[in-house]
Amino acid sequence: MDDDYIIDVKGLTKLYGDKRAIDGLDMKVRRGEMYAFLGPNGAGKTTTVRALSTLTGFDEGSVMIDGYDIVKNPMEAKAAIGVIQQHISLDKDLTVWENMMSHALYQQMPKADRKKRIDQLSEYIGLGDYYNYKVDNLSGGWKKRVAIVCALVHNPKLLFLDEPTVGLDIQARRGLWDLLRKLNNDGMTIFLTTHYIEEAESLCNRVSFIEKGKIIAEGTPEDLAHKIGRFTVEYYGLDRNTKYAYFESRQEADDFSKQFDDTYTVTVRRTNLEDAFVEMTGNRIGDNGFMLKKPEKKEGA
């Protein structure tokens, strides 16, 4: 394995009966990256995270985490991994401190190190004033922060987050984004799944579009957008049926936009990650994570 990569996956396949939840997936994630799987509910995001983080088995392929085969060397691989699942597994009847300490015990941390590590992480994340709060009394955003401390208590190199901001309001979501940026800037490799295009575009160095257990496209948000054209003309007439055209240059986009009369509303803008996702997959994702009705075929140059 190339030591530059903390995740190296080849031919990963997971079957549920005749259904391929993961379908021959190949991927690599570099150390220190913030990497996103972007796709709708049912695309295979959660199943992939569970397989990569040793929470479920798989039928074909290989997974290397931090240089260790997760089948042949599961304990070594697990030591490098922290996981936060979409549905947080905290004990709501315990305090913040009790939850964090129970995770330290689960990770078999030496007694002398537990309090020091929890205090360090809590100060870093801003949880020090909440030790005596019952978890059930915290907001969704603060519960996520407790879960992050629990996931990092054994000092892993890689953090998996499955749909980390689902159910959070916009303020809590952006607060969590800031925290993830801070962790990443300090060297943590982060692999997250999301159906929020803005989240992937704002946070991540590289993004994969995933659909039916396969990676459709992969690259930086900018590179993915540029694959369909650097500039987008968005236009609609009296029927309010929005269409799109993509161009490599602003001049081409401007020239195209001049053909429309005053009955049309026309916008020329830079192409974004959402444009690329819709163009490459033929679908849009709703706020609830489910596919919306396929848009009408776009027109373009």
Q: Which role fits each region the language model picked out?
A:
Residues 175-254, 260-261:
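ABC transporter nucleotide-binding domain
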Residues 101, 105, 112-130:
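Conserved ABC ATPase "signature" region
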Residues 159-162:
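Catalytic Walker B motif of ABC-type/P-loop ATPase nucleotide-binding domains
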